[in-house]
């Protein structure tokens, strides 16, 4: 049986945690930052976790993670 391919875009966006979850970065923090409030940018800074609703999609994209 052939190996399952990893979705490379997902591999660059998500990192597996010790408890089986996945870390992710928040969106909206790349460009056009001058019109966004400092508070909004500060809250987007820390890493988040993938929600349980989306976990199945991420696991399917990363079969060897």
From Swiss-Prot:
Q: Quick one: a GO biological-process term for this protein? A: translation
Alphabetized GO MF terms: structural constituent of ribosome
Q: Name one GO cellular component term.
A: cytosolic large ribosomal subunit
- PROSITE patterns reported for this sequence: RIBOSOMAL_L35 (PS00936)
Pfam families attached to this UniProt entry: Ribosomal_L35p
The alphabetical list of record keywords is:
Ribonucleoprotein, Ribosomal protein
> InterPro entries this protein is in?
Ribosomal_bL35, Ribosomal_bL35-like, Ribosomal_bL35_CS, Ribosomal_bL35_sf
Q: Which residues form the signal peptide?
A: none
Protein family membership: Belongs to the bacterial ribosomal protein bL35 family.
Q: What is this protein called?
A: Large ribosomal subunit protein bL35
Q: Specify the species.
A: Yersinia pestis
What is the phylogenetic placement of the source species in the record? Bacteria, Pseudomonadati, Pseudomonadota, Gammaproteobacteria, Enterobacterales
Q: Which gene encodes it?
A: rpmI
């Amino acid at each position: 049986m052939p190996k399952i391919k990893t979705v490379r875009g997902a591999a660059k966006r998500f990192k597996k945690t010790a408890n089986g979850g996945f870390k992710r970065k928040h969106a909206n923090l790349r460009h056009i930052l001058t019109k966004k409030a400092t508070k909004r940018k500060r809250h987007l800074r820390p890493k988040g976790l993938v929600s349980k609703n989306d976990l199945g999609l991420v696991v399917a994209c990363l079969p060897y993670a």
